[in-house]
Amino acid sequence: MAEKTITVEEVLKHNTRDDLYIVVKDKVYDISKFLDAHPGGEEVLVDLAGRDASGPFEDVGHSEDAQELLEKFYIGNLLRTEDGPQLPTTGAAAGGSGYDSSQPVKPAMWLFVLVMVVAYFAFRKYVLK
């Protein structure tokens, strides 16, 4: 029997507490019935709804038992297309780094960098004579 394939569009539709899909390593899981049992709390999973959760799943360092449990919720393989919508990746709320390279650097960050550079050279000039 052939593996079921699930499109990105389909995954994106399942993003609520009652109907929740996540993707880990291009495998799609329906974890709707697991929310209450998740040791890390249901909010962690809700934040990952309809997204690629590969990064956060790996970052947590789930045990072999947790990985086997996840397989019980497997429903198919993700079908990605070049011209179709892309699956959102996770951010800080979902346990990722929160860094989004598509966002410009804020002026406050530039000011912080400038202050640090000036402090570095002042330290070298006046303290490390």
UniProtKB/Swiss-Prot annotation:
It is a single-pass membrane protein. GO terms for biological process: ergosterol biosynthetic process. Pfam families: Cyt-b5. It is found in: Endoplasmic reticulum membrane; Microsome membrane; Mitochondrion. Residues 3-79 form the Cytochrome b5 heme-binding domain. InterPro entries: Cyt_B5-like_heme/steroid-bd, Cyt_B5-like_heme/steroid_sf, Cyt_B5_heme-BS, Cytochrome_b5. The chain crosses the membrane at residues 105-125. GO terms for cellular component: endoplasmic reticulum membrane; intracellular membrane-bounded organelle; mitochondrion. Heme binds at H38, H62. Disulfide bonds: none annotated. The keyword Signal does not apply. GO terms for molecular function: electron transfer activity; heme binding; metal ion binding. Keywords: Electron transport, Endoplasmic reticulum, Heme, Iron, Membrane, Metal-binding, Microsome, Mitochondrion, Transmembrane, Transmembrane helix, Transport. Membrane bound hemoprotein which function as an electron carrier for several membrane bound oxygenases. Belongs to the cytochrome b5 family. This is Probable cytochrome b5 2. It comes from Schizosaccharomyces pombe (strain 972 / ATCC 24843) (Fission yeast).
